[in-house]
Amino acid sequence: VRDRIDEAFMLPNVPASGIQRIRGIEGQSGRLTGEAEWKRTIITDGGLVITPLLAFQADADYFNASSASLQAIDDMAAARGLTADTRSSFARFMATAGLELRWPVLFTGPGSSHIVEPTAQLFVRPNETYVGGLAVPNEDAQSFVFDATTLFERDKFSGYDRIEGGTRANVGLRYSGSYGNGWTTNALFGQSYQVGGVNSFAQPDFVNAGADSGLETARSDNVGLAGFSTPGGFSASLGGRFDEQTLAMRRSEGKAAYSGLPVSVSARYTFIQAQPSYGVPEDLQELSFGRSARLAENWRIFGSGTYDLEKNFFTGDGFGFAYDDECFSYTMTLSQSRNRDTRELTQSIGFNISFRTLGDFGSTTGSFAQ
């Protein structure tokens, strides 16, 4: 059960853009989710790798919001010419039949080997339900990024509150190389197509997840990634999302990291073109960094920070500690973030307990805990 009290429900507009969004509700919402997946890999005599897939997800949701939150939902729906379909409870399901084809081709040379792998996927499923009328209280799928790392995901949403529906094809070309001196290289380039049904990423929800993402049209933006790693623990990569027609840069990201003992550090530069409907009214440039230090065999501390290069201030930072052994892990994090427009400070605490053979529960406040 989630119980969120968020002042954002009183202010559904993003001040800088005028686009209505609802980042949280006052009240209670809960969801019970069950998911199952079956897949099998078949390799033909010609080297073609065929992977059929079947998946099923079922949810039971309830929603009990305050009158002010319900009014904010009605206002957002009216602004988009919709009728709010708010429900106190509902059930939904998504069944998927998928097929993936990969054809890895190996090339070898003096001191190196290279694999080029054309890949195609097709996922057939019904349309997503309860999204056109803002019925789903989207809380755990608000964060959304479409790039090369998510191109071949069956469901590209970041959480369970949204479920990708409709028939979609993903195509791309993978490359990996290894060298005698221990270096490795990798690259990926591809595109996604909505070939049938309703495009989930073009449907409204509380935060407009999917809007201006590069997936809201029938033919997605192009995404690419290239990187390398060294035997000394250093790695770097460059990735980007490019307009499907003009190839103009929509998003880019550069990463560099060093992983060693006892210290690991990383840095990342990100450019995001304005996404007004998603709450980014102007171009965004950020510099993020992270560090981790192992204090003993099972204990480590870590931290991260993000600096806004456009407005010249830290938008977020945090730190934490973790314990890991062969059967149990525990993570505690403390973080704070600042609104880019108002500089309002939000602080949070998160934890996660994981049993290797049983599962995990809790929530961490950021990816720097990884």
Model-derived segments and spans:
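Outer-membrane beta-barrel proteins and related beta-barrel translocases across Gram-negative bacteria
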Residues: 1-370
